[in-house]
């Protein structure tokens, strides 16, 4: 059994954050909330999503796992206004998710979770540098880099965090000192990342006041931020692009 009611804009943002990684997911539903762990088909990006029961206006659930087509639910939520309430229900033993929004009632067929890629193991990484910055600053730097190159260098040098992109003839670089950041833990960090992934991953951060980046040298980057006034969290782990000498 699962019954819940949640703000439409919050649900849209949560689904959009997952959809940048995969099209289909296994939702783990528990009395304390919902969680998803998924990795993209190329094994380059991983998404970790948690939404506690306090993020919902109403929430009641037994432990279960369901498979969802994110494209279907994204299309369905497209008709909802930002202040609408989305009501969802799942009866025990049913493979249909009932959704009410904007005066419309939908019956959404669920996917068999066993046909969806299994939940990945989250690697334990020792990332020496940590940067906390405003989400809009991160998004701005990535958008600027897109116009120059297909990859971006991110690192920490002393008390400065930098993001840099180089093309054949052009270059863009953003430096932020300790006084321009929300927080900085200095450490040896310099890694190159694909903008094909970064561009989509940072889209949800535009509305976020604090984004935490954990970095190393030629290591994955962990991008972590809260949603739903702290009742939820989204984390991305993105593998670096290693260039041969």
Swiss-Prot record:
Gene Ontology MF term list: DNA binding; DNA polymerase processivity factor activity
PROSITE patterns from the UniProt entry: PCNA_1 (PS01251)
InterPro entries assigned to the protein according to its UniProt record, in alphabetical order: DNA_clamp_sf, Pr_cel_nuc_antig, Pr_cel_nuc_antig_C, Pr_cel_nuc_antig_CS, Pr_cel_nuc_antig_N
One GO biological process term: regulation of DNA replication
Keywords tagged on the record: DNA replication, DNA-binding
SUPFAM superfamilies, alphabetized: DNA clamp
Highest taxon of the lineage: Archaea
Assembly and binders: Homotrimer. The subunits circularize to form a toroid; DNA passes through its center. Replication factor C (RFC) is required to load the toroid on the DNA.
Homology family: Belongs to the PCNA family.
Described function: Sliding clamp subunit that acts as a moving platform for DNA processing. Responsible for tethering the catalytic subunit of DNA polymerase and other proteins to DNA during high-speed replication.
Record protein name field: DNA polymerase sliding clamp
Source organism (scientific name): Methanosarcina acetivorans (strain ATCC 35395 / DSM 2834 / JCM 12185 / C2A)
